[in-house]
Amino acid sequence: MVTAKCRPVALFKEYLEKGYYPFLLEGEGEYYTRIEQMINYIIETELPQICKVDVSNIRKIQALIKLVCDEVPFELNANKIASAFEIGRDTVVEYLKYLGDARVLNLLYSDKKKVGKLAKPDKVYMENPNLLYALSPGKVDIGTARESFAVSSLSESHTVEYGKAQGDFKVDGKYTFEIGGRGKDYSKIAGIPDSYIFADDWDIPDGSKLPLWMLGFLY
């Protein structure tokens, strides 16, 4: 049993901040700097070369990423962002999709089967919580970090949709997941079949309440 061999809750808290990328093994001191360099390379080099992004919009893409990091929760208003950044609404959606393909962001839709080419996502997360801590130091909302981890882990081999009124996420069109801390109760998912709570301050499964760190075993 995992809990007999280590302290998963304590280790999980460390992992949310540092642990996603293997270059952590080269030393913790430069870990966040390496992440920033990686993101800048994607934005400044790969997007213009591969996706033909206008280099004059690079700073706007950087600002868009910063917005995703800082807003809690980040539910997309593409028209508002387009107006603020002085670019087209479709361009905003296009850039988000590029960043999703580059594994900088995870884009969630309330109904993935009906997503069109220029459909805006309902909710946007950084691809993993380490990006939050690297790009928005001192401002990370723990709820956002939890959800970012959950989406990142589940998306490897499952379909994840924005839950809207029923839970945080709908998984594979069947399961309803609510993400939270130790005190999270069943009020938002009461009476919903195949619904579960994943809590980060939780050691072992208790009925339909499961440790959030267990999702890390999915990949």
What does each of the following model-derived ranges do?
Residues K97, R103-Y219:
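A cross-kingdom feature that marks ATP-driven nucleic-acid transaction machinery
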